[in-house]
């Protein structure tokens, strides 16, 4: 059986590095994970990211703010908990324009070779699936550039796209 996760990352990138700002993850059963990194360098953000991402983050006193190490450990537990000890179960990761999201997620463990074996080495792309399905009408997005809101929206997209 496949256990699917839908996620989104907000990040700062400069062509050389992808610096995680926040990550939101939801599954098909209502479980959610949200975290904001205490370690991103906001000074490197372009004005658009400052305005559309950083200014919309929860206040620094919010418990969503965590170190990258804590995000990594808690995200791992969140992802593997439903399949732990269940032979034949595998995880799927889904995102919209998934490439950078996967890099931001995988870099929580450092080099790609350090990614735990339970976590997929790639993220399936909802945007590509949308093209493959003939671009059907999708639910409207709200709260853009909020990782958890976007992850929920990715699940709503999946609900439309999962059947041809």
Question: What do the predicted segments below correspond to?
Answer:
Residues 93-98, 104, 136-164:
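Acidic, Mg2+-coordinating catalytic module of metal-dependent nucleases/exonucleases
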Residues 69-73, 77, 124-127, 149, ...:
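Short, contiguous clusters of charged residues that form electrostatic/catalytic patches at enzyme active sites
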Residues 117-137:
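Short, flexible loop segments at boundaries between secondary-structure elements
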Residues 2-96, 141:
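Conserved non-catalytic scaffold segment of RNase H-like nuclease domains
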Residues 100-120:
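Substrate-recognition/cap helix-loop segment adjacent to the acidic, metal-dependent catalytic center
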Residues 15-17, 31-34, 108, 132, ...:
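Active-site-proximal flexible loops/turns
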